[in-house]
């Protein structure tokens, strides 16, 4: 009787993580990643506007940050799990198959930050301030993305008998292969083993840190990248102990899982930044791009603008200015007088230019 109750209390895995609509594959992992990105952009933009920024800024920055983040996340995953793709029995082409899962958060944050920096430079806004605005939204997006791991039957912990243990099913694909690691497969109904749902632990931890960040931001009104640093430190603290519960294959550094090692280093760096950064919050005026420079017009030309030359007068207009007509004959005495006057004027002009050059 006790055994039956325990089994009924286990969390079942989804029967599959991929559905096909004709030739199109709908992958739960990709859908949750997309939902997380949308939530991060929408909520992040609202927080940015509430802090004094312009509406739509986060979307503009995301155009740079999201592609960079996806590439960085995949690169980190491949580098820290390289035997899967480049070791014995591995296929290097699989490293490009992002839809099969495998994004490292550290690579996503690092390279995504580079993309955000580029976007902020183009918009003329401070990157630390943007990071503070989107920090809770990014962490909530991470929690949503972890549900994709649930459908893929991945990122789980050691085997357990706790009532909230996760059932991992055997899955069969189209060619008849049977394994719990088949992302494209469908459950056979047979339970391979029961494990700690570490992806769920991380998702719940992320939600708790999101609530903490929102409270701290409202209570203390911190800025200059310090809230983002608090997000990084909080996430690292949770990721460190969750990694210790995982039993899946991972690269090791001095016998420690690489993600635990990275979490510890980044945690320390985040705390150092948190205490060293400027206190208080940015002035709302700093969150809006500066107005464009002055537009040239009359008066002195501004930088980057070329002064317009006065249009040259034709012979007929010049004659009218001198009080003569182009068709009126000019006497020899008058012509000589005009030439003499023009010569003197030319000499004065040359002398004047010499004086200007010597100033």
Curated annotation (Swiss-Prot):
Residues 306-323, 350-359 have a biased composition (Basic and acidic residues). Its main location: membrane. GO terms for molecular function: phosphatidylglycerol-prolipoprotein diacylglyceryl transferase activity. Pathway: Protein modification; lipoprotein biosynthesis (diacylglyceryl transfer). A 1,2-diacyl-sn-glycero-3-phospho-(1'-sn-glycerol) binds at residue 146. Disulfide bonds: none annotated. Residues 284-359 are annotated as: Disordered. Residues 336-349 have a biased composition (Low complexity). Its EC number is 2.5.1.145. Belongs to the Lgt family. PANTHER family: PHOSPHATIDYLGLYCEROL--PROLIPOPROTEIN DIACYLGLYCERYL TRANSFERASE (PTHR30589:SF0), PROLIPOPROTEIN DIACYLGLYCERYL TRANSFERASE (PTHR30589). NCBIfam families: lgt. This is Phosphatidylglycerol--prolipoprotein diacylglyceryl transferase. It comes from Rhodococcus jostii (strain RHA1).
């Amino acid at each position: 009787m006790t055994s039956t109750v325990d089994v009924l209390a286990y969390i079942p895995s989804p029967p599959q993580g991929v559905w096909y609509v004709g030739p199109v594959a709908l992958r739960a992992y990709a859908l949750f990643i997309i939902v997380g990105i949308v939530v991060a952009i929408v909520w992040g933009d609202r927080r940015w506007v509430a802090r004094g920024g312009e509406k739509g800024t986060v979307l503009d920055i995301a155009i740079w940050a999201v592609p960079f983040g996806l590439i960085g996340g995949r690169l980190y995953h491949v580098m820290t799990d390289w035997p899967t793709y480049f070791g014995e029995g591995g296929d290097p082409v699989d490293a490009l198959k992002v839809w099969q899962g495998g994004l490292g958060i550290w690579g996503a944050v690092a390279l995504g930050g580079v993309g955000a920096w580029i976007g902020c430079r183009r918009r003329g806004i401070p990157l630390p301030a943007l990071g503070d605005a989107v920090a809770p939204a990014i962490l909530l997006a991470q929690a949503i993305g972890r549900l994709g791991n649930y459908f893929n039957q991945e990122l789980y912990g050691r085997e357990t008998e706790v009532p909230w243990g996760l059932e991992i099913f055997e899955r069969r694909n189209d060619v008849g292969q049977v394994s719990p690691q088949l992302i494209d497969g469908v459950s056979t109904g047979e339970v391979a083993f029961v494990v700690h749902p570490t992806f769920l632990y991380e998702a719940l931890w992320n939600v708790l840190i999101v609530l903490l960040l929102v409270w701290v931001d409202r209570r203390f009104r911190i800025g200059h990248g310090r809230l983002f640093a608090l997000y990084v430190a909080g996430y690292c603290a949770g990721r460190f102990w969750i990694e210790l519960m995982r039993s899946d294959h991972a690269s090791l550094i001095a016998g420690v899982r690489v993600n635990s090692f990275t979490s510890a280093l980044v945690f320390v760096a985040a705390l150092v930044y948190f205490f060293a950064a400027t206190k208080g919050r940015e002035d709302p005026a700093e969150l809006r791009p500066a107005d464009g420079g002055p537009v040239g017009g009359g008066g002195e030309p501004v930088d980057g603008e070329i002064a317009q030359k006065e249009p040259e007068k034709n012979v007929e207009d010049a004659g009218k200015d001198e009080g003569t007509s182009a068709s009126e004959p000019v006497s020899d005495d008058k012509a000589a007088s005009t030439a003499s006057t023009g010569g003197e004027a030319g000499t004065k002009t040359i002398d004047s230019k010499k004086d200007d050059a010597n100033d």
